[in-house]
């Protein structure tokens, strides 16, 4: 069905209107329409979060039903408030099943790193967002863009488990853009090695994105 086609397949079929609508259609929403969607999504998350161990570690038995109740019942938190559960990577305490754990450094924290769980639906949202960014970065006006599977992308990113490492993986599900150097090689290099080789390859092959 049309639903399961990815960006590359739609480009092959020259479905440019559908591509724009799917990934960039949100730009046509009014502020009210946009906020309505945001509120609905937020309330969905509140429901899931309130019913899991992580949420209840903050809520202590309370169950906010909407955004206003959530704001009244839930204090401002920092990573510190979630650290014990997240650092132990306890999936049964979370609102969804994590398929990957991302990490960042934790300056001044009680542990050298912070970890964050990503569920499949979070990765799907991330994939849609990076694809929209890719399209918009080549766009001069509404509906016009210039993306092709033959494009080259400089791999100047920190690899997994850092969040930027998700980028090539997410994009690969949509379009087989070539990274310079190739992702499998890049992840085993130091940052400077990766950049030096990437720029060298770009001079030989050309470069569409960085």
Language-model regions, residue ranges each:
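Nucleotide 5′-phosphate-binding alpha/beta core
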Residues: 2-103, 107-210
């Amino acid at each position: 069905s049309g639903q399961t086609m990815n960006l590359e397949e739609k480009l092959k079929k020259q479905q440019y209107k559908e591509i724009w609508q799917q990934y960039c259609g949100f730009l046509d929403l009014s502020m009210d329409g946009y906020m309505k969607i945001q509120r609905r999504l937020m309330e969905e998350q509140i429901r899931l979060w309130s019913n899991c161990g992580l949420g209840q570690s903050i809520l202590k038995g309370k169950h906010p039903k909407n955004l206003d109740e959530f704001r009244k019942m839930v204090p401002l938190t920092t990573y510190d408030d979630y650290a014990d559960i997240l650092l132990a990577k306890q999936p049964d305490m979370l609102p969804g099943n994590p398929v990957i754990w991302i990490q960042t450094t934790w300056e001044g924290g009680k542990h050298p790193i912070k970890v964050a769980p990503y569920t499949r639906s979070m990765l799907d949202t991330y994939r849609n967002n990076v694809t929209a960014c890719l399209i918009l970065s080549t766009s001069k006006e509404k509906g016009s863009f210039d993306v092709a599977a033959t494009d080259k992308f400089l791999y100047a990113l920190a690899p997994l488990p850092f969040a930027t490492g998700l980028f090539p993986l997410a994009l690969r599900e949509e379009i087989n853009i070539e990274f310079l150097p190739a992702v499998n090689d890049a992840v085993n290099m130091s940052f400077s090695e990766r950049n030096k080789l990437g720029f060298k390859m770009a001079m030989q092959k050309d470069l569409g994105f960085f």
